[in-house]
Amino acid sequence: MQAEYGDKVEFIVVYIREAHALDGASPRGVGGDHPIVEEPLTIDERLTVAKRCDAKLDLTPFTVVIDDIEDTANTSYAAHPDRLYLVDKEGRVGYAGGRGPREFFPNELEDAIREELGLEPIEHEEEEEDRGFPARRRPR
């Protein structure tokens, strides 16, 4: 999506608290392949962990910002563990996706982006079932 719409839409990754911190409730997550880090206690620690995440996932095409240590963005947007949002040209939430991974549907975000940009809707290829969760399409 960033390659398709990045010249018209700014894609921002907000690094929030750790979903699978070693000292958290779910240190290994579902797949057990998450990096082992403790929950940062200071903004400098969070910045260090966020930089490692940025490098590991190669988030180069995106603007990456970090939530403050009080988790203001995370709390305000119910972002944990991950969410997709579209903020429209007036600064209002134009799309709020469900909580990931079970309610994480990028096609819905693309539909909302296209609508915001005044582009014709597109038909999405049927998504394969991914991560063991059934594919879903936004009702028209």
PLM ranges: what are they?
Residues 1-57:
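Structural microenvironment flanking redox-active thiols in thiol-disulfide oxidoreductases
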Residues 3, 55-61, 110, 122-123:
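Beta-propeller folds
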Residues 6-10, 58-62, 81-82, 89:
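Loop/turn elements at helix/coil->beta-strand transitions in domains of secreted/extracellular proteins
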Residues 12-14, 65, 85:
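Hydrophobic/aromatic beta-strand patches that form the interior of the parallel beta-sheet core
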Residues 37, 41, 64, 100-103:
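Short N-terminal micro-motifs specific to bacterial/archaeal maturation
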Residues 40, 44, 62, 69-72:
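Gly/Pro-rich cap/lid or specificity-loop segments adjacent to the active site
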Residues 68-140:
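Thiol-/selenol-based redox modules, centered on thioredoxin-like
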